[in-house]
Swiss-Prot record:
Protein name stated in the entry: UDP-N-acetylenolpyruvoylglucosamine reductase
Alphabetized GO MF terms: FAD binding; UDP-N-acetylmuramate dehydrogenase activity
Phylogenetic classification of the source organism: Bacteria, Pseudomonadati, Pseudomonadota, Alphaproteobacteria, Hyphomicrobiales
Annotated FAD-binding PCMH-type domain residues: 34-199
The keyword Cell division is annotated on this UniProt entry: yes
GO cellular component entries: cytosol
EC numbers, comma separated: 1.3.1.98
Annotated function: Cell wall formation.
Active site: R179, S228 (proton donor), E298
EC top class, as a word: oxidoreductase
Alphabetized Pfam families for the sequence: FAD_binding_4, MurB_C
Cofactor: FAD
Similarity comment text for this entry: Belongs to the MurB family.
UniProt source species: Bradyrhizobium sp. (strain BTAi1 / ATCC BAA-1182)
Subcellular localization(s) per the UniProt record: Cytoplasm
Amino acid sequence: MSFADITPDLKAAMPELRGRLLANEGLAPLTWFRVGGPAQVLFTPADADDLAYFLKHLPAELPVYVIGVGSNLIVRDGGVPGVVIRLAPRAFGEVKVDGDIVAAGTAALDKRVAEVAASANLTGLEFLFGIPGTIGGALRMNAGANGGETKDILVEATAIDRQGVTHHFTNADMNFTYRASGADPSLIFTAARFRGKPSDAEAIRGRMAEVQAHRETAQPIREKTGGSTFKNPPGHSAWRLVDAAGCRGLKVGGAQVSEMHCNFLINTGNATADDIETLGETVRERVEATSGIALQWEIKRIGLKAR
């Protein structure tokens, strides 16, 4: 499927734009599942000022979606109408340390932020080492693993709104809850500051090694997957509910519930986005039928289904 090419109109309305605009650009290569249709417009801003300029001049009726490394994302097969903004590491991926503060652009990999903190002998950020995403996603969903969450370490987040205005948010402003933040969904996060605590370098590295060992042995990290599919309901583990419903190894087309970890869906090689989403919905139905619990998606789904 392809969309009307609106990039000439956008370029004409934004003569000072420095970033890259592409029409009908495939998104599958930008996601871990490797599925999905194109973006009507894919915009890669040159820097935060360029992003603000773009948003200020973008027609209000055009929907906007933001992606990082696509690790927690299903792009539907019909593609994404409107604008998809991809924050590239070269412009939004810097990580630096000042005292006990770790400052990171939102395209920085969570793992990289943990490594930089460890190099500065700062503890508290080790949990990020086991999260296969970027800081932007961590802010949006209060990403967490291995006993830590983004809310535990955030000092301040910087974001740009649809009018191109920059805002700064404290930890309290973010209104974090389990795997979510209360920040306006239209905000695009560009940077964050985290606080660590001075500690022993060897101990920090040891904890990071434990995190990596757990991922290697318990999660299908070599597969085409989107990470944890469903949020853990209060008092329950999603994977246990999925397993109890008899869904371990369940398949729909080229999509399968991982045999290694039941809360991971994988693309076995030829899955469509619809295969993966249908499998997820089938799992939700079976879990609710057996336990009475309605699982909530943790993976973000965007775009249109194929016609």
